[in-house]
Regions:
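C-terminal cap/substrate-recognition subdomain and adjoining C-terminal extension
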Residues: 65-183
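Active-site neighborhood of HAD-like aspartate-dependent phosphohydrolases
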Residues: 1-45, 49-50
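Short connector loops/turns at beta-strand edges and beta->alpha or beta->beta junctions
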Residues: 25-26, 57, 118-119
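Gly-rich Lys/Arg/Thr-decorated short loops/hinges at beta-loop-alpha junctions or inter-strand turns
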Residues: 30, 56-63, 122-126
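Metal-dependent phosphoesterase signature
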Residues: 47-77
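Conserved active-site and cofactor/substrate-binding residues in soluble primary-metabolism enzymes
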Residues: 15, 42, 58, 71, ...
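Short, mixed-charge, low-aromatic patches
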Residues: 4-10, 33-39, 56, 96-104, ...
């Protein structure tokens, strides 16, 4: 049995890329692209590349400052602890960044984390991600991989997310939950 969560605006209260945009001074540009992508109006991959490109030059120390501001959604820590006590595996499948997902993994005891690898060179964000972009289709693919690894069926999966890029994961899970869903 497995519960898979989106990260931004689901397990945590904020959208990390918007927090990073604040640090980079590009809030308005990134926020507009993010809203359109979450509503499914702009292709996620292209919008993601555009948003990440705007972060080019951001110092790695800014990621640490953002990490300090991130708040776990009320009740999420208790939910994860309860799921673990009941024998469930947990996963973060996020269009956000592994830098933050791995911190949450350590903090909450999450079993799996799959997100985008923010490329950092010489202590600065390059404006690119390493590896394939974790979009909606990739989330569903990663969920299938975890299910195979755990030797369970998709019917034994609960998936929780808030945006258009979560729909493929929610659709294949035994139970898909739209949490604070965007219109």
């Amino acid at each position: 049995r497995l519960v898979a969560f989106d990260m931004d605006s689901t397990l945590i209260e904020s959208e990390v890329i918007d927090e990073l945009a604040e640090e980079a001074g590009v809030v308005d540009q990134v926020a507009a692209i993010t809203k359109s992508a979450m509503r499914g109006e702009i292709d996620f991959d292209e919008s993601f590349r555009q948003r990440v490109a705007l972060l080019e030059g951001l110092e790695e120390s800014a990621l640490e400052r953002v990490q300090q501001r991130i708040r776990v959604t009320e009740g999420a820590e208790r939910l994860i602890n309860t799921l673990r006590a009941l024998g469930y595996k947990t996963a973060i499948l996020s269009g956000g960044f592994t830098w933050f997902g791995e911190h949450l993994q350590r903090q909450l005891g999450i079993d799996y984390v799959h997100a985008n690898e923010l490329e950092i060179e010489n202590g600065r964000v390059t404006g690119r991600v390493a590896g394939p972009i974790v979009n909606g289709e990739r989330k569903a693919e990663l969920l299938r991989d975890i299910v195979a690894h755990e030797q369970i069926s998709l019917e034994q999966v609960i998936a929780v997310g808030d945006g258009a890029n979560d729909l493929p994961m929610l659709d294949i899970a035994g139970l898909g939950i739209a949490f604070r869903a965007k219109p």
